[in-house]
Amino acid sequence: MAEKRDYYEVLEVTKESTVEEIKKAYRKKAIQYHPDKNPGDKEAEEKFKEAAEAYDVLSNPDKRARYDQFGHAGMSGAAGNGGPFGGFSGGMSMDDIFSMFGDIFGGHSGGGFGGGFGGFGGFGGGGSQQRKFRGSDLRVKVKLNLKEISTGVEKKFKLKKYIPCSHCHGTGAEGNSGSETCPTCKGSGSVIRNQQTILGTMQTRTTCPTCNGEGKIIKDKCKVCGGEGIEYGEEVVTVKIPAGVAEGMQLSMGGKGNAGKHNGIPGDLLILVEEEPHPELIRDENDLVYNLLLSFPTAAIGGAVEIPTIDGKVKVKIEAGTQPGKVLRLRGKGLPSVNGYGTGDLLVNVSVYVPETLSKEEKSTLEKLEESKNFKPSTSIKEKIFKKFRSLFD
């Protein structure tokens, strides 16, 4: 799909929908487009993935908040794979989607739902509930200057984290010993416990204590990782930061966190954006603000001054009689919206410099000018200044 659809549109829900309503909508879409029900249908498979991606974001309060504020740019993509931050192409396979589906609805995890669409019987809670371990998230900070924010930028991070064990390739087993079905849960990953109550016998399904929900146990543990399937290592990750990001915004890159045990689901890489202060410009959302200090003669007779922008200095014409407090607007010289909807402006706040000391000649000149009616504020000017002052308290 060339252009990403709105996640709410994908699941046919609204921004006011609850998590339960979103879960219900996802379940409906997953049943409709599940590969077992649509064998060989690539379009259905893509819609199945699309629905899973939408659910992954909208069911998570943090991801949903970022998406509501910044759209798809808030879940921005990783350089090189084109996948979405927090999406599936960055680190989740179809198996992972199936596993997530099983976790949500009590279905079977793995390469499918068990030899045909009937595997969806897990919805009732009676199916197997094999568990996949998810690795923990990693958090990093990235400091950006206004130039980088205005254009977007790629940043490389050298991450020290848990990766799949190089000796056992993440299985946790030594050599070809592999694993065997858990004798306690018979491979289901869960056990049923009976409890006598005043209402009779109550049955509850819980995670198997022997295999921790995996449905299998390792016969001969890897001598390098001790059967965990992970080891400490390094990875260099390139992150594409979209233009228009702001201080405090958190991006997430799916699948680039710590590896999950036994080839489980990797965690996410969370990137917290920090802004470097600019020596002359101040950010106000997508606008930039510059405080211009004019000399009195320039304000009175006009002229041209250089104004700093992100892309260098530009000359701006100053009209004769420019008053302190006037705001000049340079359209399109601000920052782009992270959603891609327009660009802010550069606002130039004008102040007039009054010298603190004067020579005798300068003082004499000003005393002569003071007698001119042009140097005496008119009633209309006084009223204008008073209205501006009063508006500060409204």
From Swiss-Prot:
Zn(2+) 2 binds at C182, C185, C208, C211. GO terms for molecular function: ATP binding; heat shock protein binding; unfolded protein binding; zinc ion binding. A zinc finger (CR-type) spans 152-234. One of its GO terms (cellular component) is cytoplasm. Disulfide bonds: none annotated. It is found in: Cytoplasm. Zn(2+) 1 binds at C165, C168, C222, C225. CXXCXGXG motif repeats lie at residues 165-172, 182-189, 208-215, 222-229. Keywords: Chaperone, Cytoplasm, DNA replication, Metal-binding, Repeat, Stress response, Zinc, Zinc-finger. Residues 6-71 form the J domain. Binds 2 Zn(2+) ions per monomer. SUPFAM superfamilies: Chaperone J-domain (SSF46565), DnaJ/Hsp40 cysteine-rich domain (SSF57938), HSP40/DnaJ peptide-binding domain (SSF49493). Its cofactor is Zn(2+). Coiled coil: none annotated. It holds the Pfam family DnaJ_CXXCXGXG. GO terms for biological process: chaperone cofactor-dependent protein refolding; DNA replication; protein refolding; response to heat. The keyword Chaperone applies. Belongs to the DnaJ family. The J domain is necessary and sufficient to stimulate DnaK ATPase activity. Zinc center 1 plays an important role in the autonomous, DnaK-independent chaperone activity of DnaJ. Zinc center 2 is essential for interaction with DnaK and for DnaJ activity. Participates actively in the response to hyperosmotic and heat shock by preventing the aggregation of stress-denatured proteins and by disaggregating proteins, also in an autonomous, DnaK-independent fashion. Unfolded proteins bind initially to DnaJ; upon interaction with the DnaJ-bound protein, DnaK hydrolyzes its bound ATP, resulting in the formation of a stable complex. GrpE releases ADP from DnaK; ATP binding to DnaK triggers the release of the substrate protein, thus completing the reaction cycle. Homodimer. This is Chaperone protein DnaJ. It comes from Bacteroides fragilis (strain YCH46).
